[in-house]
Amino acid sequence: TGIGIGYIFRDRFSLRAGFYNADKKYTASPSAYNAPASFYSYYPYLVKVDADCRVYEIPVSLGYHFGARKNHSWFASASLSSYLMKRETYNYSYKTSAWGTVQQREWSLYNSNQHLFSVIGISGGYQRKITNRISFIAEPYLRMPVNGVGYGKVKLNSAGVLFSLAVEPAAFMLRKQKK
């Protein structure tokens, strides 16, 4: 869930920014989890990490619109995002010795990691006008961190489809009609 604002200029380019609230759940292998060295004195034989994180994502993107028709258009965009980690909950599966039984321990952090402009994104999408002021947008995306994310500095790539409604402000519509 979230909110964004954008502006299309010269009927081809767009600049957008947003604020999204997301839950990131993942499982990481010991080789993918890059915690500080002191961590491994507590979990010397890490088996896996299950994570459940609440993240605020703040993307800034530049887009190019092509194939514009009266009621629809296609676009491609590139973005840089900041991730603000609000809550990180980790469930560690580990052994105290190489032959020991697997044990579990949960640990949570709050407001501890901020990754400013450290996630690169690419997307493409389709925008369809519903009315003069409202459009529906479907936008498949791929996001890749430049550095690891969270306490374990995990390369948390993500992909999905963002569905959104775009509303053109009434004041902008009045200016367009006067031209």
Locate predicted features.
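Solvent-exposed loop/turn segments connecting transmembrane beta-strands
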Residues: 1, 69-70, 149-156
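Residues on the lipid-exposed face of transmembrane beta-strands in outer-membrane beta-barrel proteins
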Residues: 3-9, 19-21, 58-64, 78-82, ...
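Repeated loop/turn-to-beta-strand initiation elements of outer-membrane beta-barrel proteins
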Residues: 12-15, 72, 132-136, 170-175
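Extracellular/periplasm-exposed beta-strand and loop segments of Gram-negative cell-envelope proteins
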Residues: 24-54, 85-98, 102-115, 151-156
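Long, positively charged binding patches that form subdomain-scale interaction surfaces
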Residues: 11-15, 42, 48, 55-67, ...
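Outer membrane beta-barrel transmembrane domains
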Residues: 105-118, 129-131, 156-179
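Transmembrane beta-barrel architecture of outer-membrane proteins
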Residues: 1, 12-14, 53-59, 73-75, ...
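Conserved catalytic residues of ABC-type ATPase nucleotide-binding domains
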Residues: 1-15, 22-28, 32-33
